[in-house]
Swiss-Prot record:
The modification N6-acetyllysine is found at residues 14, 106, 259, 333, 353, 361. The gene is RPL4. There is a cross-link at residue 361 (Glycyl lysine isopeptide (Lys-Gly) (interchain with G-Cter in SUMO1)). This is Large ribosomal subunit protein uL4. The modification N-acetylalanine is found at residue 2. There is a cross-link at residues 239, 327 (Glycyl lysine isopeptide (Lys-Gly) (interchain with G-Cter in SUMO2)). Belongs to the universal ribosomal protein uL4 family. Pfam families: Ribos_L4_asso_C, Ribosomal_L4.
Length: 421
């Protein structure tokens, strides 16, 4: 399978190259922006929604009134009457059985979304650019292993087909019938409530046929499941990128393929069929940075490489870090030492002054002066001080004289206790 080329071969209805070539339109080289495609698809798809809402009377078609406080039950309105299970049950609230929903839906919701025209065109250009990349088309699930070329262009004679068998024969000759067989094999029952809402069956997407004029081509291809037919002048992003995912398999007619340059422009020439529009530009024309940096011609366009390494220095607080402070102010060490000495000197002066005042006061009362007591550290609780060993005369005086030991008397035995016979 060939890749995207500047010249695209045109294939006949027999599946062979007709010998004619078509220049690849510039729109196939447009920037690929899946984010824009997804955004535009999401917003345009919202325009097909049908308004819905619950009834305004739902949950309120009963007579209920709150019992008030003092009954040890919630203050929710309760159904009146008796003789039935319903009486006394809560009503109206969204937490009650049979009550209304929270924030009932209204039909005046903002259902539709407006999308900028330029943004819609950008999305279509990106979706068209993906049609020429086999990897993206295959990742979407299309069976294009045997397709001769992408984009696949056929002669304009196909636009005059009116019979289904002619369309089947063409798809088989172009090796695109495998994609239709995939659709047949994927038909299955929908999971969920959609089965009850006229959406019973689902299936995969098949190829998209893009034509210029309808001379019967719609009747020929419309019977096959999964096939979508689009006019090249009315391309739809919902059909080109189903689900907001780029890469759908498309088959073009020759006249439709040639018309793309007039519809979207070529960068050098604006679009002739649109007013004041040209293709979006790429952010980078060449993404190979190594090639750009090593380009020999015109090196002045590039800034000279920065060879000097600027290392970030961790700034430490000199008020907390003495080493950094000494770098900034070497005299700081001397200042600190002088401050400590001055504080010690002042403390000594205060103590001497207090001692002198106490001595003068004691002399007035006739009591010899005492030195002022200093603060002692807190005593530890539960710790006994070890006793100092007593040495010298005190030790001899404190020792008690040993009592004279008497010889131990022997206790009489049982035989001695017996009286002599």
């Amino acid at each position: 399978m060939a890749c995207a080329r500047p010249l695209i071969s045109v294939y006949s209805e027999k599946g062979e190259s007709s010998g004619k070539n078509v220049t690849l339109p510039a729109v196939f080289k447009a920037p690929i922006r899946p984010d824009i495609v997804n955004f535009v698809h999401t917003n345009l798809r919202k325009n097909n929604r049908q308004p819905y809402a619950v009834s305004e009377l739902a949950g309120h078609q009963t007579s209920a009134e709150s019992w008030g406080t003092g009954r040890a039950v919630a203050r929710i309105p309760r159904v009146r009457g008796g003789g039935t299970h319903r009486s006394g049950q809560g009503a109206f609230g969204n937490m009650c059985r049979g009550g209304r929903m929270f924030a009932p839906t209204k039909t005046w919701r903002r259902w539709h979304r407006r999308v900028n025209t330029t943004q819609k065109r950008y999305a279509i250009c990106s979706a068209l650019a993906c049609l020429s990349l086999p990897a993206l088309v295959m990742s979407k699930g299309h069976r294009i292993e045997e397709v001769p070329e992408l984009p696949l262009v056929v002669e304009d004679k196909v636009e005059g087909y009116k019979k289904t068998k002619e369309a089947v024969l063409l798809l088989k000759k172009l090796k695109a019938w495998n994609d239709i067989k995939k659709v047949y094999a994927s038909q299955r029952m929908r999971a969920g409530k959609g089965k009850m809402r006229n959406r019973r069956r689902i299936q995969r997407r098949g190829p998209c046929i893009i034509y210029n004029e309808d001379n019967g081509i719609i009747k020929a291809f419309r019977k096959h499941p999964g096939i979508t037919l689009l006019n090249v002048s009315k391309l739809n992003i919902l059909k080109l990128a189903p689900g907001g995912h780029v890469g759908r398999f498309c088959i073009w007619t020759e006249s439709a393929f040639r018309k793309l340059d007039d519809l979207y422009g070529t960068w050098r020439k604006a679009a002739s069929l649109k007013s004041n529009y040209n293709l979006p530009m790429h952010k980078m024309l060449n993404t190979d940075l190594s090639r750009i940096l090593k380009m020999p011609r015109d090196p002045r366009a590039l800034r000279a490489p920065r060879k000097k390494i600027h290392r970030r220095v961790l700034k430490k607080n000199p008020l907390k870090n003495l080493r950094i402070m000494l770098k900034l102010n070497p005299y700081a060490k001397t200042m600190r030492r002088n401050t400590i000495l001055r504080q010690a000197k002042n403390h000594k002066l205060r103590m001497d002054k207090a001692a002198a005042a106490l001595e003068a006061k004691s002399e007035e009362k006739g009591v010899p002066g005492k030195k002022p007591r200093r603060k002692k550290g807190k005593k530890t609780v539960g710790v006994k001080k070890p006793k100092k060993p007593v040495v010298g005369k005190k030790a001899a005086a404190t020792k008690k004289p040993a009592a004279d030991k008497k010889p131990a008397e022997k206790k009489p035995t049982t035989e001695e206790k017996k009286p002599a016979a």
